[in-house]
């Protein structure tokens, strides 16, 4: 019987295998072929197969994503199910499972950087090694430490992406003398690189960098309460370009309700905050303002009144939907809430919600302590629409 099945499989042409495999969830496509045969592996790594898969799944929901609390792998909220990956659990579950299975001592390894292309950067304290991994597919490579690793800040991982495929990545560390120690997947080597910062500063925050489009972004503080977003493009090809930039926040003439932080949406850097604006009658009105960074200038894209939220000032902005810039999320003492910035609709969410299409929104693990949330840093972790085996010049583990 088994021999007959194998003969039947041998009669299937490569075109037929493409059609069969393209109807599977992305998680199955990535994890199964490497266990079966080289032919399947060759099929799924082709551009034609990727185009076929995306055309068959074009009506699926956006990829799964989660808002993670940095430093502790706590999942603030998650969206998953009924997409290309067809996951049964949230991304936080897969991260926790991956770390538990990968490391004997769970506490010795921590996630230090999240991306919007399905990769996380893990630091193993005992050996000073780094691991670049996709916790869902379990693809993982180990990056051995450089001999120059004495004292450094971990900035994160910058990625080079083309047509949705990760072609390369760089692990970026910053030494106290503001020299970068960079590991490149294309060379398999660590190298030192220095840059000139285009502004004077009092302090910089290296605990919450954002990885986006080959660049890393983080917050810096100048004199007279001037806050900046610092960005460095680690894949700039024009040597004449200023790869290091400092962009002042757009609301320096106002007093924001919350400390300044950024999120990402649809491939852009986003900033939102809440301000008390005087009304005509002299009373104050809370307004949520959202800006998008375009050509190194902040553009106000949404401004909406929050007077309709009748809970007092009892909510904290969390971030923007990675796939929908007009949807933002806030946390109150009772629950997660979302606001549609286009029409002003406000939705109070349950801890777990199931849509009719099978999509799941989960915020059950979010800490209920408002002070904890207020003082935490958050990062979006997003799975891509397609996951090609990511490049590596070091051994897979």
Swiss-Prot record:
Ranges where the F-box domain occurs: 6-56
Source domain of life: Eukaryota
Transmembrane annotation, as ranges: none
Pfam families found in the cross-reference section: b-prop_At3g26010-like, F-box
InterPro entries with a match to the protein in the record: At3g26010-like_b-prop, F-box-like_dom_sf, F-box_dom, SCF_F-box_component
Protein name from the UniProt record: F-box protein At3g28330
Organism: Arabidopsis thaliana
